[in-house]
């Protein structure tokens, strides 16, 4: 089975840390999002992955589809809950 590799950058950190993830191309992208969020210690439920152009990626597809459509350079954005205590 073929693998795809993503470079995921954490945009909320001024140092712009990144992780390189290699997954089988049939992996659901929701799993990639969850794993990337765990690696950066941000909540997966309130995070989104976007392209460098700022285009949001629908996680309801395979990692292979995302790679073909958007390439390997992605960003993760943790969405903070404003006003919650």
Swiss-Prot record:
Ubiquitin-like modifier which can be covalently attached via an isopeptide bond to lysine residues of substrate proteins as a monomer or a lysine-linked polymer. The so-called ufmylation, requires the UFM1-activating E1 enzyme UBA5, the UFM1-conjugating E2 enzyme UFC1, and the UFM1-ligase E3 enzyme UFL1. Ufmylation is involved in various processes, such as ribosome recycling, response to DNA damage, transcription or reticulophagy (also called ER-phagy) induced in response to endoplasmic reticulum stress. Interacts with UBA5. Interacts with UFC1. Belongs to the UFM1 family. Coiled coil: none annotated. It comes from Gallus gallus (Chicken). One of its GO terms (cellular component) is nucleus. PANTHER family: UBIQUITIN-FOLD MODIFIER 1. Keywords: Cytoplasm, Isopeptide bond, Nucleus, Ubl conjugation, Ubl conjugation pathway. There is a cross-link at residue 83 (Glycyl lysine isopeptide (Gly-Lys) (interchain with K-? in acceptor proteins)). The lineage of its organism: Eukaryota, Metazoa, Chordata, Craniata, Vertebrata. Residues 84-85 form a propeptide. UFM1 precursor is cleaved by UFSP1, promoting its maturation: processing of the C-terminal Ser-Cys dipeptide is required to expose its C-terminal conserved Gly residue. There is a cross-link at residue 69 (Glycyl lysine isopeptide (Lys-Gly) (interchain with G-Cter in UFM1)). It is found in: Nucleus; Cytoplasm. One of its GO terms (biological process) is protein ufmylation. This is Ubiquitin-fold modifier 1.
